[in-house]
Amino acid sequence: MIWSPAEQLPRAELRVLQLERLGSTFGLEIDSLDGLSGLPFTSKSTLRDAYPFGLLRVPVGELARVHASSGTHGKPTVVGYTPADLEMWTELMARCMTLAGVRPGMLVHNANTYGLFTGGHGFHQGAERIGAPVVPVSGGMATRQAMLLHDLGAQVLVSTPSYAIVVGQAVQNAGIDPGSLKLELGLFGGEPWTDGLRGEIERALPGLRAVNFYGLSEMCGPGVAAECIEVREGLHVHEDHFLVEIVDPQSGAPLPEGDEGELVFTTLLKEAMPLLRYRTGDIASITTEPCPCGRTTARIRGLRGRRDDMVIVRGVNVYPSNVEHALLSLPDAAPHYQVVVERSGSMDELTVQCEPVGAEVDSVGLRGDAERVLREHLGIRVRVDVLAPGTVPRSEGKAVRVVDRRS
């Protein structure tokens, strides 16, 4: 189902619309989108230097709401929304959720955290706009989540992908037959994840189809891009609202379509805090190949994760998603892991902590298998510690995948 005609605009018309909105929002006079590459970037440091409200284009008193990032690497990124921004965000979330398969009347179990985090509110607003009732459970209390999923019969689960695994385990621990749940869709975002984890989620919650969502608080929160339920091969970017580029992470030079690089976004309609050429730190590629679903928008592919989470070990770039992909190729490895980085002399050393799927698994054998597949996938030797089931920390929000002990 198509929510907005903008999802099927011919590419040439879309570029004209983007150029018009770019000029209107930023007062730029450029003849083509190719001129964008000559303009400066904004980044996390830009926002930190302007903390908390230095980049607002309207007085604080004219805002309708304020959200903020988690501030994992320092002070949080504060984002303001005018009433028009909230309306835009709601429409974008309705568009995303519709392309992901949500229909009017479907009961949505929202296990994303509410508060400063945008995830809970964004999905709530989008569902209500579609006409899908919401159970605003928020995060935490996995046993209660399992009970409510069973008793209320929700058809849609919203959470981070790592928390979906926690909920699936809670369903089993509560003695509930996962096959008795009425779940049809899982809408997951807030952290990078792989097709391997998608498979683990769908096995833990049978009948559910897992769909990937992408967003960041600096843009609006969730609602920037999402997979279509028909294909699930790349996240459709809402290009009438966000202009996306791929640049070289080191030089900032534009890269051709299909090359892997850093995602850069420009907001085209935001009022409170428009951002020009914002460097996300997220590594992926872009394709404008037509999608079988009928949408013409560009798609994000191969989203590895943030450069902040990348670890360089003996000259090799290692992302948590690389580790996840390798581990989940092993049937005895559970979808819970952490990457621990430590300094040994002048070298960085990597240890992957993981768990077996059950206490009956031979941990020595799993360790050997894990070290082998990690060496094959990463090209370097990595130490693996197999911990007892339930030892790797769980999270109700974004999973902590990298533990840096070098300082």
Regions found by a protein language model. Give the residues of each.
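Active-site phosphate/ATP/adenylate-binding loop shared across adenylate-forming ligases
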Residues: 4, 38-205, 211, 223-229, ...
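Conserved AMP-binding/adenylate-forming
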Residues: 193-290
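AMP-binding/adenylate-forming catalytic core of the ANL superfamily
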Residues: 157, 264, 269-378, 397
